[in-house]
């Protein structure tokens, strides 16, 4: 049976994972699953707004309402507000407590259900909450030590993810600005007309038709598309007589065109 040191090492090894390996839809499912296995419980991670970032159900609660929260990836506002008032780990909360993960209709089914909630901090900010629960087994001091370590590890990963997202946003904005600065007025006009033809972020267009409609030459459109593609703003593929297939991969171009 793993001792406390071995369990701690398993938790801290999570930090060795790259942010790029996180799933976009539920980025912390794997992390919640590992914590659930190590601490022997169910676990979920929510951000400050109550959005579910990841969860692991090692032991089924047999409650449709709780599972609906997970499917919707959003916790009720009342629970989120109550959780935000937890500044230190609250352990072994009974089913009567407002912070229990067990809804009122399951109190008779799981009368001994216990919930532990730990705040997640990072960079001096409250980033979310780590919630773990068991149907009938108390969390001991060793478990709570692991919870404290886990919340710190999750906080570091959340900060890493936020930093990565911010850097990616800045990179995309910079790419758009640089691309726009290379366009002439006519090319900018062409880009606005082209993207206006798309169905969402992608679609088929015919350059000659657009050129005739806005009163520019086809070569202006071709040059504009080439500049955007070289900047990583769009992807294009010739469809021969049917025109050109276009896909926008940097959506920041749409915001920039609103200023045009």
From Swiss-Prot:
Keyword hit for Repressor: yes
Presence of keyword Magnesium: no
GO molecular function: DNA binding; DNA-binding transcription factor activity; GTP binding
GAF domain, as annotated region: 1-159
Pfam families (UniProt xref): CodY, HTH_CodY
Portion annotated as DNA-binding: 207-226
Broad class of the protein's primary localization: cytoplasm
GO biological process, one term: negative regulation of DNA-templated transcription
Subcellular location: Cytoplasm
GO CC entries: cytoplasm
Domain of life of the organism encoding this protein: Bacteria
Keywords: Cytoplasm, DNA-binding, Repressor, Transcription, Transcription regulation
NCBIfam families xrefs: codY_Gpos, PRK04158.1
Protein's job: DNA-binding global transcriptional regulator which is involved in the adaptive response to starvation and acts by directly or indirectly controlling the expression of numerous genes in response to nutrient availability. During rapid exponential growth, CodY is highly active and represses genes whose products allow adaptation to nutrient depletion.
Assigned protein family: Belongs to the CodY family.
Record's protein name: Global transcriptional regulator CodY
Source organism of this protein record: Streptococcus uberis (strain ATCC BAA-854 / 0140J)
Gene: codY
